[in-house]
UniProtKB/Swiss-Prot annotation:
SUPFAM superfamilies: Immunoglobulin (SSF48726). It comes from Oryctolagus cuniculus (Rabbit). PANTHER family: T CELL RECEPTOR ALPHA VARIABLE 18 (PTHR19367:SF42), T-CELL RECEPTOR ALPHA CHAIN V REGION (PTHR19367). InterPro entries: Ig-like_dom (IPR007110), Ig-like_dom_sf (IPR036179), Ig-like_fold (IPR013783), Ig_sub (IPR003599), Ig_V-set (IPR013106), TCR_variable_region (IPR051287). PROSITE patterns: IG_LIKE (PS50835). Residues 1-20 form the signal peptide. Glycans are attached at N134. This is T-cell receptor alpha chain V region RL-5.
Amino acid sequence: MFSASCSVTVVVLLITVRRTNGASVTQTEGPVILSEGSSLTLNCNYQTSYSGFLFWYVQYLHEGPQLLLQSTTENQRMEHQGFHATFVKKDSSFHLHKSSLQLSDSAVYYCALRRGASNKLTLGTGTLLKVELN
């Protein structure tokens, strides 16, 4: 009788795209290295000829991307886990801020744009944030 064991590892990759169907997202280039307790600003600017929704995703080491913040309303400040961002349409921006970083904030951060009712996301290239001990 033949017996075989097989181990399969599935790796999911997030591919970042700067420009999709006339839309583009640019964000702070990384890596960004800051000390614990420092403040953070990651810039995100977009271009699109359509109305859109903006998002920040975070991807921790060995994990998939997770939604951090989303904006559906202009000039509304969104907050989660100490992070905040405001969609400023006149500046085409959705900058991510945190006043006091923790070591656990080390991750890759992606700004994303979804055009109107479309399910397609246009992603920034991602910004690696490394938070170090003081």
